[in-house]
């Protein structure tokens, strides 16, 4: 694995931490990556904390993960290995904060993978601190679309972040939000190169006026709803 980079904490307030701490049997590594999750129609910021410690190989996810999040372990491991990187053979703990809110969906795959590799590779932590990262991973390392990229982009802007990395298929939706740079990613390797070797992702721009002007008209109304007469009358 080589010698990890020296300990460094970004004093600019970026929500990212890279640290090396003396450990009884070796080295302990910690990385923190920001992503987002959706509850209903609203999104909130989630901190993905990845801790890699010496010990028997193990992988634990905490922070009220639902089934799809627990299953991310196998997707992340295969995506990392099939992208040409080494998956750590150590004791890994992934914490999704805030821990009191249930986490669901597959959008945590990409930030978890970036966190694992940020703790063991030389990535630009100053840049990492500027981004929210979200996306599902296929076993070969491709970044697949997720639900809720629009409210996630809104949450990023409201939290003061100016950049977000999303799956390529979600880029136009997220780019509707003004005041934030949206970077579409097609593979895990592209994201890692973006932080290790310099900008590898290009921000996408959306012509909002054209997008809304060309949207198909909505022809549905309450007459299409069978029953629920009292509810329809109340809404009217």
Residues of each region from the PLM?
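Peripheral, non-AAA+ core regions of ATP-driven protein-machinery
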Residues: 2-7, 11-236
């Amino acid at each position: 694995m080589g010698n990890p980079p020296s300990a460094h904490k970004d004093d600019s307030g970026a929500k990212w931490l890279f640290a090396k701490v003396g450990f009884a049997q070796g080295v302990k590594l910690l990385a923190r990556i920001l992503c987002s999750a959706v509850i209903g129609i609203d999104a909130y910021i989630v901190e993905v904390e990845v801790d890699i410690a010496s010990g028997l190989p193990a992988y634990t996810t905490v922070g009220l993960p639902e089934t799809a999040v627990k299953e991310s372990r196998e997707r992340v491991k295969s995506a990392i290995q099939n992208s040409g990187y080494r998956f750590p053979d150590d004791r890994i703990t992934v914490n999704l904060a805030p821990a009191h809110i249930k986490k669901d969906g597959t959008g945590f795959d990409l930030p978890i993978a970036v966190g694992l590799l940020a703790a063991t590779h030389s990535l630009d932590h100053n840049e990492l601190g500027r981004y929210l990262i979200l996306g599902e991973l296929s076993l070969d390392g491709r970044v697949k679309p997720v639900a809720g990229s629009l409210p996630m982009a809104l949450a990023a802007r409201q939290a003061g972040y100016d950049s977000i990395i999303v799956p390529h298929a979600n880029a136009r939706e997220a780019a509707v939000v003004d005041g934030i740079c949206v970077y579409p990613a097609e593979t895990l390797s592209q994201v890692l190169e973006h932080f290790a070797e310099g900008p590898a992702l290009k921000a996408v721009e959306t012509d909002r006026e054209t997008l809304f002007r060309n949207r198909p008209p909505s022809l549905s109304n309450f007459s299409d709803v069978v029953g629920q007469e009292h509810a329809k009358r109340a809404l009217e």
